[in-house]
Regions:
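Basic, Lys/Arg-enriched alpha-helical interface segments
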Residues: 1-74, 81-87, 94-99
Length: 99
């Protein structure tokens, strides 16, 4: 385990641009989640599991992780990672991401 580099899919950036202002998302909370993912220590992963309900996905999203951002209700982040990169793929609500 070690610090990862963050990389963002075009879809993630598009989701963020489309929804952040309209839904009044607190981007500081998103930055905190991204920092926890990128830090990639046992402590930060435990915090993601405990406070943000991080879990692995199945089906079309198999091999990826998902967690909730802060206490924002239905605001999710989906990412995958390898030994050096955390690749943030999508962000949004359940009904947008899991159609």
């Amino acid at each position: 385990m070690g610090r990862l580099t963050a990389d963002f899919a075009k879809a993630f950036s598009r989701d963020l641009k489309k929804n952040a202002k309209r839904r009044n998302w607190n981007l500081t909370e998103l930055e905190k989640v991204i920092d926890l993912v990128v830090e990639n220590t046992p402590e930060t992963l435990e915090e993601l599991r405990r406070r943000h309900n991080m879990h692995t996905l199945s089906g079309n999203w198999r091999g990826r992780y998902e967690c909730h951002v802060a206490n924002a209700g239905d605001w999710l982040v989906i990412w995958s990672s390898n030994v050096s990169v955390a690749f943030f793929e999508r962000t949004g609500r359940h009904d947008e991401l899991f159609r």
